């Protein structure tokens, strides 16, 4: 199995690569982790990971500036239906639009806009930086065997915006930060984490292992 992590100049690329390598090794999964900026590597990969940190508009522009990469994603994810995981802004790019700084077009896989978080508690700081729990809204194979809820494992977040999905069925998990904020989305062979699995220790490694086993 070859897993393509897309290098478009954004994301915790080294830590993401190391986390996927570790998860595969500890789970006994034979996987080559390919950090790549080559569209043909993405189009032919068995699984695709899109990381991302920073502003939506910048990440969208960076991805679109890579000749052939958008077409490669369409080929692998839409046409071949290979498993896809977006991380942080990579997850946000799965949306219809991002409303940070300006209006930017996303991949359109999860209908909805990425909007600024507005916690009901004014003492909560933006961005949300740190550990928080997850509430599962709809069962998903990537959370198999992972304890969630108030007394469950914690995920690591760094974000000021979240995906306001049009369809509640696309929201797999939320996190409470002065209200329910989208933490994980999924539809068909596509999944996305607002948190950073590569920084989320036990929860993150378990989720990555589940992604490597996932057969949507």
Curated annotation (Swiss-Prot):
<dbReference type="Pfam" id="PF00117">
    <property type="entry name" value="GATase"/>
</dbReference>
<keyword id="KW-0315">Glutamine amidotransferase</keyword>
<feature type="active site" description="Nucleophile">
    <location>
        <position position="88"/>
    </location>
</feature>
<feature type="domain" description="Glutamine amidotransferase type-1">
    <location>
        <begin position="2"/>
        <end position="216"/>
    </location>
</feature>
<dbReference type="GO" id="GO:0000105">
    <property type="term" value="P:L-histidine biosynthetic process"/>
</dbReference>
<keyword id="KW-0028">Amino-acid biosynthesis</keyword>
<dbReference type="GO" id="GO:0016829">
    <property type="term" value="F:lyase activity"/>
</dbReference>
<dbReference type="GO" id="GO:0000107">
    <property type="term" value="F:imidazoleglycerol-phosphate synthase activity"/>
</dbReference>
<dbReference type="InterPro" id="IPR029062">
    <property type="entry name" value="Class_I_gatase-like"/>
</dbReference>
<comment type="function">
    <text>IGPS catalyzes the conversion of PRFAR and glutamine to IGP, AICAR and glutamate. The HisH subunit catalyzes the hydrolysis of glutamine to glutamate and ammonia as part of the synthesis of IGP and AICAR. The resulting ammonia molecule is channeled to the active site of HisF.</text>
</comment>
<dbReference type="InterPro" id="IPR010139">
    <property type="entry name" value="Imidazole-glycPsynth_HisH"/>
</dbReference>
<protein>
    <recommendedName>
        <fullName>Imidazole glycerol phosphate synthase subunit HisH</fullName>
        <ecNumber>4.3.2.10</ecNumber>
        <ecNumber>3.5.1.2</ecNumber>
    </recommendedName>
</protein>
<keyword id="KW-0963">Cytoplasm</keyword>
<dbReference type="InterPro" id="IPR017926">
    <property type="entry name" value="GATASE"/>
</dbReference>
<dbReference type="GO" id="GO:0005737">
    <property type="term" value="C:cytoplasm"/>
</dbReference>
<dbReference type="GO" id="GO:0004359">
    <property type="term" value="F:glutaminase activity"/>
</dbReference>
<feature type="active site">
    <location>
        <position position="196"/>
    </location>
</feature>
<comment type="subunit">
    <text>Heterodimer of HisH and HisF.</text>
</comment>
<keyword id="KW-0378">Hydrolase</keyword>
<keyword id="KW-0368">Histidine biosynthesis</keyword>
<feature type="active site">
    <location>
        <position position="198"/>
    </location>
</feature>
<keyword id="KW-0456">Lyase</keyword>
<comment type="pathway">
    <text>Amino-acid biosynthesis; L-histidine biosynthesis; L-histidine from 5-phospho-alpha-D-ribose 1-diphosphate: step 5/9.</text>
</comment>
